[in-house]
């Protein structure tokens, strides 16, 4: 009976050598365009072997959408990123087990600051802007709230502004284009001018943006992808 059940379960075979090779090619290719890669370790259920493979390939930030998975990677020599906005009940663990998180709510950013002060650590915020995909982020036309979120992240103690990010090709099937990429960069530049800062990273989405690189039309200013 056990053998029959085992045969019915799906099985995922992972070639770590090929994973490392492909990740290294990705890092090298995107580096030619001035783009840094955040390695997404989703699907593998927090498997440290796959995370280690992409770290060996040159990726220094590993991202997951579950805090429980990031707990499993604490021993690895990389920064850890929660690939979504934390829920209020997760704040303590997010600050303890992650270095970076995606954020779009001022109240959550304030909670992260309070907890980071309590834990005597620094937490980095990747502030998300919704450019029409309706997946996550502050709506790009809601400039007042966006500016408030930037201001809070800059002023609250024990927080650092990791960068400005957006999503394409997810929930709303809004594909990345030269036009919306440039619009996103323009928003980033306007925020930089207002606050007298320079975003370390302007994160332009995920693997759906690859076609712009293949076409040689990569929007100037986007220097980060979550892949």
Show where each model-derived region lies:
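Hydrophobic faces of well-ordered beta-strands that scaffold small-molecule active sites
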Residues: 12, 35-41, 62-64, 80-84, ...
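Active-site-proximal loop/turn and secondary-structure-junction residues that shape catalytic pockets
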Residues: 43-45, 66-69, 86-88, 107, ...
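Alpha-helical structural signal in soluble globular domains
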Residues: 29, 53-57, 72-76, 93, ...
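Active-site-adjacent beta->alpha loops and helix N-cap segments on the catalytic face
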Residues: 21, 70-76, 107-121, 173-183
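A charged N-terminal "starter" segment
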Residues: 1-87, 93-98
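A generic, well-ordered mixed alpha/beta core segment in the N-terminal half of proteins
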Residues: 91, 96-135
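Non-membrane alpha-helical structural segments and their capping/turn regions in soluble enzymes
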Residues: 9, 13-20, 48, 92, ...
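Active-site loop/helix belt of alpha/beta enzymes
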Residues: 131-227
């Amino acid at each position: 009976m056990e053998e029959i059940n085992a045969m019915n379960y799906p099985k995922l075979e992972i070639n770590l050598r090929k994973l490392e090779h492909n990740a290294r090619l990705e890092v090298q290719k995107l580096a030619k365009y001035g783009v840094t890669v955040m390695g997404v370790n989703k699907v593998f259920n927090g498997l440290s072997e796959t995370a280690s493979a992409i770290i060996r390939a040159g990726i220094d930030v590993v991202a997951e959408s579950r805090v429980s998975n990031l707990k499993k990677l604490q021993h690895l020599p990389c920064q850890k990123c929660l690939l979504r906005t934390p829920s209020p009940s997760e704040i303590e663990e997010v600050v303890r087990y992650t270095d970076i998180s995606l954020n779009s709510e001022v109240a959550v950013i304030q909670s992260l600051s309070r907890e980071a002060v309590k834990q005597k650590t620094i937490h980095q915020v990747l502030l998300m802007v919704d450019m029409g995909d309706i997946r996550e982020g502050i709506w790009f036309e809601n400039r007042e709230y966006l500016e408030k979120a930037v201001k809070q992240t800059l002023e609250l103690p024990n927080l650092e502004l990791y960068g400005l990010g957006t999503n394409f090709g997810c929930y709303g099937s809004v594909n990345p284009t030269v036009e919306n990429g440039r619009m996103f960069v323009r928003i980033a530049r306007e925020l930089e001018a207002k606050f007298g800062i320079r975003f370390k990273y302007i994160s332009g989405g995920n693997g759906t943006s690859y076609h712009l690189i293949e076409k040689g039309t990569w929007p100037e200013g986007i220097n980060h992808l979550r892949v």
